[in-house]
A protein has these predicted regions:
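Glycine-rich SAM-binding Motif I of class I
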Residues: 61-65
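Conserved SAM-binding motif I beta-strand of class I
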Residues: 74-79
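C-terminal substrate-binding/active-site "lid" region of AdoMet-derived donor-dependent transferases
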Residues: 135-194
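Conserved class I S-adenosyl-L-methionine
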Residues: 50-59
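A short SAM/SAH-binding and catalytic strip from SAM-dependent methyltransferases
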Residues: 122-135
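S-adenosyl-L-methionine
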Residues: 1-49, 87-120
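Conserved short alpha-helix immediately C-terminal to the canonical SAM/SAH-binding motif I
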Residues: 83-84
């Protein structure tokens, strides 16, 4: 199923990559997770309607709409780029016109990832290599503080992952590797074409 087709099904516009580069070396270029990758993730990993996913560096919001459409899950998109944030909000309006009662379950915030205040309902955190490991460490520490305040099992989902992220999670946190999801046909050519899911158990 191609990218344009899925966008049409969801009544959103997310195809295309960022032109140019961010001013800070800590933040990487926007590129949406391929729909084929998200399909494979859900083939092997369960997202429930009771879950609330936070996508850091959400761009135009593809993951939010996809997870709501497929699983009924709530989703929060965090995006520092004002243009992408506006496009995500436009997508939300378009999606809401076709999918009733979805606005309460999909939201976006325009802020730096480390400034997002983790909500006690947030339990799935998604990263498509959006920023440097220094920013990632700050975000993970915010997640851990939230779990200390409101105990719950949380998962971190990494796509096209950075070795620095893995090293930090495995050596400096209590997160444990729960699952690896390789993208058939793509992983064989590029070892980064996979998801790693880390969990923090109660």
């Amino acid at each position: 199923m191609n990218e344009q087709y899925y966008d049409a099904v969801l009544h959103i516009k997310t195809v295309g990559e960022q032109k140019g580069f961010n001013k800070s070396m800590h933040y990487h270029r926007y590129e949406p997770t391929p729909y084929s990758g998200l399909d494979e993730l859900l083939n092997q990993y369960e997202i429930r309607s009771s879950d609330r996913i936070v996508d850091f560096g959400c761009g135009k919001g593809r993951l939010n709409f996809y997870m709501h459409h497929k699983c009924g899950a709530s989703a929060v998109g965090i995006e520092m780029n004002e243009e992408f944030y506006k496009e995500a909000m436009d997508n939300r309006d378009r999606y809401a016109r076709k999918v009733r009662n979805s606005k309460d379950k999909i939201r976006f915030e325009c802020c730096l990832a480390q400034e997002y205040e983790i909500d006690s309902r947030d339990n799935r955190f998604y990263f498509f290599n959006p920023f440097s490991v220094q920013v990632f460490m700050n975000v993970v520490n915010n997640i851990l503080l939230s779990v200390e305040e409101t105990g719950r099992e949380v998962d971190i989902i990494l796509y096209y992952l950075s070795e620095d992220y893995i090293f930090f999670l495995e050596n400096q946190t209590a997160f444990e590797l729960k699952k690896e999801v390789r993208l058939p046909g793509a992983y064989e050519k590029n070892g980064n074409e996979r998801f790693l899911i880390y969990t923090l158990r109660l």
